[in-house]
Swiss-Prot record:
Any one GO biological process: DNA replication
Signal peptide from the UniProt entry: none
Origin species: Streptococcus pyogenes serotype M5 (strain Manfredo)
Family under the similarity heading: Belongs to the NAD-dependent DNA ligase family. LigA subfamily.
Enzyme class per UniProt: ligase
Gene Ontology terms for molecular function: DNA binding; DNA ligase (NAD+) activity; metal ion binding
General function of this protein: DNA ligase that catalyzes the formation of phosphodiester linkages between 5'-phosphoryl and 3'-hydroxyl groups in double-stranded DNA using NAD as a coenzyme and as the energy source for the reaction. It is essential for DNA replication and repair of damaged DNA.
Catalytic reaction equation(s): NAD(+) + (deoxyribonucleotide)n-3'-hydroxyl + 5'-phospho-(deoxyribonucleotide)m = (deoxyribonucleotide)n+m + AMP + beta-nicotinamide D-nucleotide
Names of required cofactors: Mg(2+); Mn(2+)
Protein name: DNA ligase
Keyword set, alphabetical order: DNA damage, DNA repair, DNA replication, Ligase, Magnesium, Manganese, Metal-binding, NAD, Zinc
Amino acid sequence: MKKRIKELTDLLNRYRYDYYTKDAPSVSDSDYDKLYRELVTLEQSYPEYVLQDSPTQQVGGTILKGFEKYRHQYPLFSLQDAFSREELDAFDKRVKAEFPNATYLAELKIDGLSISLSYENGFLQVGATRGDGNIGENITENIKKIKDIPHQLSEPLTITVRGEAYMSRQSFKAINEARQENGETEFANPRNAAAGTLRQLDTSVVAKRQLATFLYQEASPTARNQQNEVLAELADLGFSVNPYYQLTSSMDEIWDFIKTIEAKRDQLAYDIDGVVIKVNSLAMQEELGFTVKAPRWAIAYKFPAEEKEAEILSVDWTVGRTGVVTPTANLTPVQLAGTTVSRATLHNVDYIAEKDIRIGDTVIVYKAGDIIPAVLNVVMSKRNQQEVMLIPKLCPSCGSELVHFEDEVALRCINPLCPSLIQRSLEHFASRDAMNITGLGPAIVEKLFLAGFVHDVADIYQLTKEDFMQLDGIKEKSADKLLAAIEASKSNSAEKLLFGLGIRHIGSKVSRLILEVYGDISALLTAKEEEIARIDGLGSTIAQSLTQYFEQKTAAILVDELKTAGVNMHYSGQKVNSDAALFGLTVVLTGKLNQLNRNEAKDKLEALGAKVTGSVSKKTDLVIAGSDAGSKLEKAKSLGIRIEDEDWLRKL
């Protein structure tokens, strides 16, 4: 029986691969079902012989208690967006300045959810969401319910791969029809449906919804030399790989490919929102490296957004957490990119003046980045007698006089006691990318603020069960969950806290970079502006904003209150000391390394405090030259830059 179970498992997995990966079924559905039922019967009789990669392990489901956080061994970066041919040409110029012979691989940008899959000795161990790029959620049990993801690879590799999980248009239509019949709210679009599916606690729901994937990257070190070779290897290993891509050195050919794909976009079985262009050589990718947010070797061209006409009925003015007052237009409802849109941002007062936008105007509405509804311009031919829009002089929340700084496009409320400003700051502090206090959303924050229970973020950690129970609609169970979420947030790594403070110009990635150096929030109270500016990826604007914030007496008081409440002040990741051997130095790796691979060398340099870049310039402090080093070594010599070899690096 053991042998027959193994035969059936291998046979059914091969049929599944032919169907889902090759899109070439090699057996009829009835024959497949007959073999499948035989395997189910045998496994029920001999459970000790059930194999880890059995197709039966993808059927049915369990109820999960929740999703654990998962720290990615290899961070997931965002991509730089482009919306024009000129931006693509600028990208090409930057790349060709370093590598004149560079070729590109253009791939479809699938409108789905980024996933990371880790295998050990060929077996799937972890499936995770992207999260913030460093920490995602472990959704392995749900990932196993996606039929085209292999539980076992065709080779016993230890590897981490990346891709997109998506829902086909056909599956999306069927699911929404079923939800409509059951009186349930329909999903807005396939991407939202896929996102909701992957976060289901009932894995049987995931199995029924028929998600699919396209894999496109080996995140772990690979023996391949080119991106197109990576795609071929992924397909050989049993993954689904998108068949549409273009390999070329010509941006003209890339542009032709983009236009061809855009023309057939509606004919595809799944949603796409653009084309990703990557430098094909993995060695060149390593040399080009990354900015704080994105790789320098790739760019994502986004298709132009769908546009519709709508009438502006009125305008709301709201105060954000930094005091910026944002105008939002209330519109006659229109269908846009799969959703009903009745509100759209007008950005700021300068934008309103530039476009001469007035209440009652017919305007062109689109979704910026296919996400945020915005007003593009006015249809002047349909204007009647609309009057110029009145711009508020007083804050809509606190009544304080608004200011319009010369170097800014927005109106701003500068009253630190403005109720809206405080509430938005509290919401930001509790948000997922900051302290991630589950359940503490805008509605509850507003109730807490109006009840007088919270005035700053430190007050959150003084809340009691009785406080929550006094709020309308909060029962004992909800109060317990909120208190548990608040307590859990105390143990977050310090970069979450720093981001949560809402300091201007200090985003989540910048927060991590700062804490990698300083290690503790308390150390920022005495940090020097020039020291902060030296950190790789930052600069004077960020350094000035950070030091100005922590120079305030209120900042020291707030940090002390948070510390007293038990909120963690320490960075839990790898810290780079300011006295590290290469702290603050800009270093370039060039040539072939014989004892370290390039990733190992880069990791060591960064651990020693260096900024590793891909090109030699006057700003370069040090070049590590391996064998066969070429033009970069010559340029370093001509500029008088210090040069060391691999042995020197290994001894550090």
